[in-house]
């Protein structure tokens, strides 16, 4: 996703 927090894949 497009966000400031890290996800599984930070796109």
UniProtKB/Swiss-Prot annotation:
Q: Describe the effect of residue 11 to A.
A: Abolishes mouse splenocyte proliferation
Q: Where in the cell is it found?
A: Secreted
An annotated GO cellular component of this protein is: extracellular region
Q: Which GO terms describe its biological process?
A: defense response; positive regulation of leukocyte proliferation; positive regulation of smooth muscle contraction
Q: What is the effect of changing residue 8 to A?
A: Abolishes mouse splenocyte proliferation
**Function in brief:** Induces contraction of intestinal smooth muscle in isolated guinea pig ileum. Induces proliferation of mouse splenocytes.
The entry's protein name is: Rothein 1
